[in-house]
Amino acid sequence: MIGPPGSGKSMLAARLPGLLPMLDGEAARGSAAVLSLVGQFRPEAFGVRPYRQPHHTASAVALVGGGNPPRPGEISLAHHGVLFLDELPEFDRKVLETLREPLESGHIHIARAARHARFPAEFQLVAAMNPCPCGYSGHGNGKCRCTPDQIARYRGRISGPFLDRIDLLIEVPAVPVDALDGTGDGESSATVRSRVEAALARQRERQGKANSRLTAKEVDTLCQPDDSGAGLLKQASVRLGLSARAWHRVLKVARTIADLAGSASIRAPHVAEAIQYRRLSGG
């Protein structure tokens, strides 16, 4: 999420666990087991998806794990839950790069001297950042005085390969003052959660796991859009220069959008929405 200070990025991230289904069976036990390793498991929270928000000064060991003996880091403590990285460009770039492996594999392997450990790390990564160093680029108040070079250097702190592993990039605009005292007409968390539960049930019935865990080969089999959707994706691939990884990730997002809509097939509108979420990254 990219937006100015006070636009609600942190609040949106904190609400995400409430939109996800409760953990059950093996997933709940797996999450509890990791938390127990660092003495943070609470019986009353069994089945609740963890939400972790490490500070941007966190070291690589704090984030991915380490030590002697090896201990799980924040990515493993967020297993089956949400890992929120606020002020993303403020994290050390080398620290962020350590996330690339677990984002793909769902686990992290740690080797320290004669000690080796493999911890699970299937987490939902959510990140937030300002659009520029001062935070007000594009804001209607005209406060921003950042130069194009300063903005480019700020955004350049996040590598292309890291961004390539993020499926949804969205702008969160500032909330108008006259909208702050309104109640709004959006859906409740319970309504959205019911739709998410139904979509996840479809995925498990179809392939035995969530769309996010599909391999590239499985995506080619299970996430093919109809003719109009396929044509749209090919056009976007050329225009945006999508990598092979980005291509498969767009298909997984489109499959998920279709599942949320209750559609058995992936149609052009589903593909168009999935492509839209990658436009900020340029592919």
Regions found by a protein language model. Name each.
Residues 1-158:
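Conserved ASCE/P-loop NTPase catalytic core
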Residues 70, 93-283:
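Basic, amphipathic alpha-helical bundle interface domains used for macromolecular binding and assembly
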